[in-house]
A protein has these predicted regions:
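Conserved helicase motor
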Residues: 282-290, 294-296, 304-316, 323-330, ...
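Post-DEXD/H (motif II) to motif III coupling segment of the RecA-like Helicase ATP-binding lobe
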Residues: 333-410
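N-terminal pre-P-loop "Q-motif" helix
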Residues: 223-248
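Conserved strand-helix element at the start of the C-terminal RecA-like helicase core
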Residues: 251-261, 271-272, 276-291, 427-455
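Conserved RecA-like helicase motor core of SF1/SF2 enzymes
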Residues: 342-346, 481-486, 490-534, 542-547, ...
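Conserved segment of the helicase C-terminal RecA-like domain
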Residues: 363-378, 524-555
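Conserved interdomain linker/interface between the two RecA-like ATPase lobes of SF2 helicase motors
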Residues: 387-451, 463
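Interdomain "pre-motor" coupling segment immediately N-terminal to P-loop NTPase/helicase cores
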Residues: 116, 123, 129-214
Length: 573
């Protein structure tokens, strides 16, 4: 997306979208060829610096303006000027009234556009998609966007900008930018967020500065289920954090299956009532699609945006937003309150780009609450340093303690070609008596061999397996939810975000490096989640007792110890 550089009688440099050239007011002096926004902003910086020095000297403004044109022509490699006949200084200035003429007869369309871009950061390609959804020409959307820029409600920013000796993407913050020669000189392209569309130094983003809400709201909040005692305690602390705490961040460390998401609903309702915008974010879209019906159930009548890669409608209206962390990159300082679920999950964990995007989606003085059952070491360090408030939710709703994993050591490796299963047939039969079995393995290559192995030893059982790239994955998991399998073999794709009634868990090769303490806690957290089946069996089968296994078991025991101390669980014999 390119812009025309404009110049007024005072020597002030401005710009106008290239697609809007026909709408330029009469008397505007501009370059004949459009330029990338970054070059125009360099020219603006150049003229502003010269104004502060002796460059201008004395004399008529017309002579000064001619000198600026000459210098800018040299600076921009010989660009030629389109100079109209001028009658007054006002002829050089793009007035708000002239820009507003672009919406004459399109007031309803402009209103729709205005509501859909609040707090957004959008590329030219995304603005064209919005034009298709509003069933209008892209040039009209461009005029609407520039009108907001002229009214200081938004700005155009280069997608990738020079930073020191390198570059930085303005959408995801990435500094590892691919550099290449262009017609306009050296240019940079960000590959980190390319799935959202191109981001180069020759492109520009429309960045809207307005919040999603313009005032207090009447919010209908009707919780479907009352909060438990443990949830009420945590919910009160979340509310106190939002209202009173000077700290900008909090960590809600919850037991698996304790209902941490619902704990945040009362605080979200209060924030909306106060005119604050709220975002529920998560790395994985299946979490978003799981939370969406629960939010819609408890917030009837509240418009909610649900934004994931699989949702066909990209632009929605709503004061309450549910989005994957990738979709959050399309917002800029839009939210007063952000709840991030599963902060330790892929692809957010370890992604500086997604972390940068989430931070920059928060408004100044906004609050960020991380929700997880398995906090990262970095988050725990922030808590210890006093930079992040810690809130604990150690108990599930049924007041049973969390099941503790049992470690069973074996000499033989857990390669499916080994004779291990023949030695443990009775063990698996014993576990099956307690409920259906979910078996976790560390490698995709182990799935089918173990499925075949189990089928050979248990011919009467219904046995299946799946992994991330399995084309039948969703159908198999649907059948698993319906209880159609006696035993199911999986990689870590099922370690979180799924509740299976009466399931028992076995982790084969639990000492494998891919199974860190967070993965092991999450896998153990599949057991005992419902009131009908509040307990169960978790077995870590391994050749050794790894540090991750010890840490995972210690974390689970610590949750039970804290819950018992607070009177949130009952002793069981």
């Amino acid at each position: 997306m390119y812009f025309f550089l404009t110049l007024n009688k005072n020597g002030d440099v401005g710009y106008f979208p290239a697609g809007e050239k026909d709408r330029l007011p009469p008397g505007i002096c501009c370059l004949k060829r459009p330029l990338p926004l970054g070059l125009i902003q360099n020219a603006q910086d150049w003229t502003n610096k010269r104004k502060k020095g002796r460059f201008w000297g004395s004399g008529l403004k017309e002579r000064q303006c001619d000198r600026v044109k000459s210098e800018l022509c040299r600076l921009l490699n010989g660009q030629e000027w389109n100079v109209p006949k001028l009658s007054s200084q006002e002829d050089f200035v793009t007035s708000d009234c002239q820009l507003a003429s672009s919406i004459d007869g399109r007031e309803l369309m402009f209103q729709a556009f205005d509501e859909l871009v609040l707090g957004r950061q959008l590329s030219w390609g995304e603005l064209k998609i919005l034009a298709r959804e509003l069933r209008c020409e892209a040039e009209i959307i461009l005029a609407f966007a520039h009108l907001n820029v002229e009214r200081n409600m938004a700005e155009w920013v280069p997608a990738v900008v020079p930073q020191g000796k390198g570059w930085q993407c303005q959408r995801c913050g990435e500094r590892n930018i691919k550099e290449w020669p262009s017609y306009y000189g050296r240019a940079g392209t960000c590959l980190s967020c390319k799935t959202l569309g191109p981001s180069t130094s020759l492109e520009a983003f429309y960045r809207d500065h307005r919040p999603l809400l313009k005032g207090q709201e009447n919010v209908n909040f009707y919780p479907h289920w009352p909060l438990t005692e443990a949830q009420n305690l945590a919910s009160g602390q979340v509310l106190a954090f939002l209202n009173n705490s000077a700290q900008p961040k909090a960590l809600l460390w919850a037991a698996c299956g304790s209902g941490k998401t619902e704990v945040c609903f009362p605080s979200a309702a209060r924030a909306l009532e106060e005119g604050k915008s709220v975002l529920f974010a998560a790395p994985r879209q299946d979490v978003i699609h799981d939370v969406a019906p629960r939010l819609k159930r408890d917030f009837p009548g509240v418009p909610i945006q649900v934004l994931t890669g699989s949702v066909p409608i990209r632009y929605q209206r709503g004061n309450l937003v549910l989005a994957t962390t990738h979709q959050v990159l399309r917002f800029w300082q839009a939210f007063d309150v952000i709840f991030l679920d599963e902060m330790d999950a892929f692809p957010y964990q370890g992604s500086e780009a997604l972390e940068w995007g989430l931070t920059h989606a928060l408004r100044p003085k906004g609050k960020l609450i991380y929700l997880t059952a398995t906090p990262s070491l970095e988050a725990l360090k922030e808590v210890r340093r006093g930079n992040m408030l810690l809130i604990r939710l150690p108990a599930r709703h049924h007041r049973y303690p969390l099941p503790i994993p049992v470690v069973e050591k074996y000499r033989n490796p857990f390669d499916p070609k080994s004779n291990l299963l023949s030695l443990n047939k009775a063990r698996f039969e014993s576990i099956r008596q307690a409920g259906r079995i979910l078996v976790f393995v560390p490698k995709i290559s182990w799935i089918q061999p173990w499925v075949n192995c189990f089928r050979r030893y248990f011919p009467d059982w219904k046995i299946e397996g799946s992994y991330s790239s399995d084309k039948e994955r969703f159908d198999k998991i649907s059948d698993l939810r319906q209880g159609k399998f006696d035993l199911f073999v999986s990689t870590t794709i099922l370690e979180r975000g799924i509740t299976l009634e009466g399931i028992q868990v076995v982790v084969l090769g639990a000492e494998h490096p891919i199974f860190d303490e967070r993965a092991l806690v999450q896998m153990a957290g599949r057991v005992g989640r419902t009131r009908e089946n509040p307990s169960g069996t978790i077995v870590f089968m391994s050749c050794s007792n790894s540090t991750a296994m010890k840490t995972a078991i210690q974390w689970i025991k610590d949750q039970n110890r804290l819950a018992l101390k607070q009177g949130l669980i009952d002793l069981r014999t």
